[in-house]
Amino acid sequence: MNGAELKQKLMAKAKEIGIDKIGFTTADPFIELRERLKESQDKGYASGFEEPDIEKRVRPEHSLPEAKSIIAIALAYPSKLKNPPRSEPGAYRGIFCRASWGEDYHHVLREKLTLLAAYLQELVPKARTQVMVDTGALSDRAVAERAGIGWSGKNTSIITEEFGSWVYLGEMITDVYLPPDTPATDGCGDCTICIDACPTGAIVQAGQLNAQACIAYLTQTKGFLAEAYRTKLGNRLYGCDTCQTVCPKNRKIHFDHQAAFQPDPEKVKPLLKPLLHMSNREFKEKYGQMSGSWRGKKPIQRNAIIALGHFKDQTAIPDLIELLMNDPRPVIRGTAAWALGRIGGQAAEEALRQAKGKEQAEEVLREIDKALDMAHAG
Ligand code: B12
Ligand code: SF4
Ligand code: SF4
């Protein structure tokens, strides 16, 4: 069977196993990406979550010797919640980004790619394959762009004609030759809506992100969140969708045919207060299947505290005092102090003063002092 015939068969199989979009490219090095990754590292824009070895990232043969082709796939995920529960005074809610709705996409895409790889091996028994989703060495976006899945938007997301940017990406490298597709071309034109809408100015120029300033990244950090960003976080518990929700290419785009990505509204828009006292076990049981739980419960709890401060939720004061006084984690005590300072009031101020008398950790004491100033000024 020649490459073109193989490709046709793979495309038909992909459809059968529920892959929404498939594209093909060569395993040639990603030359342009090399410069971009280098610049991102040099300027301190990288998140640190990506593979640090640039050569591994741009040369597919580092992942699979004698690589010849890459098969890129995309799966669409929903952008809207049916009957979303509403935040109400005293019962405020946080939000997980859409890429964390439903089952963890890593498993779902990997499973489909593994089925596709098995099929290729049926057709070409000597074929070798390497499957990747997010955590692999390659840039999933650079692969998708070159394989014609979608163009690289100014917000850095891959945007497909059919599903907008609400797609997960993954790929399979193989040593089998498959004719490449045409790379996607820019569809943003003069638009700059995402750049203007980004709350932290993290899109430093069209297509280039300073991940260190991106809320999606900041929600995943484990330490204290720099003060300047706390008020920008809003009620985000994990990730940030702003530069995608504002994008005109996503207007009216909502695909919920992938059963695995159906969100449970109570999980993706949970009440904030119950999150504060969750045990590790409860957290794992409730959120363990979501991709947004990969950093554990601490960042989510820290962000929940910030969200309560953002809403100035008076009814959260007793919970926040409890954390300030008794939580063993300095980041949680210090962030609770910040939230109490923001909410203000006599009970908050008194608790902060009391905590100041017994707190040992320098960084928490600094937060308490600032919070007392804030409570006083407010
Ligand atoms: C590290 C990482 C992050 C970091 C950094 C993101 C970033 N933009 O670099 C953080 C934590 C911030 C993040 C956030 C998100 N991520 Co993320 N992330 C990754 C990861 C693991 C590596 C990305 C990377 O290498 N970045 C470094 C840059 C330099 O590389 P790159 O983005 O791949 O480069 C492309 C473009 O950015 C562009 N580019 C880069 N530099 C420059 C410079 C110029 C001048 C120009 C014009 C273009 C350009 O060229 C490349 C080809 O398209 C990938 C998975 C993977 N292995 O690739 C997922 C991935 C990119 N993330 C994904 C998702 C869904 C998200 C979020 C939407 C989740 C959320 N809702 O919070 C946000 C989006 C934030 C944003 N504006 O990008 C999806 C993207 C799907 C899509 N449709 O594009 C991926 C592909 C995971 C997956 N397999 O589905 N992510
Ligand atoms: S994900 Fe949020 S913070 Fe990051 S670039 Fe987009 S709008 Fe800005
Ligand atoms: S908002 Fe505009 S510039 Fe940004 S990604 Fe969408 S189309 Fe491109």
Regions found by a protein language model. Name each.
Residues 2-10, 17-22, 330, 350, ...:
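Long C-terminal interaction/binding lobes of large macromolecular proteins
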Residues 159-183, 210-229, 280-284:
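Short, charged low-complexity linear segments at domain edges
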Residues 282-286, 313-325, 345-357, 378:
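Amphipathic alpha-helical scaffolding segments comprising HEAT/armadillo-like alpha-solenoid repeats
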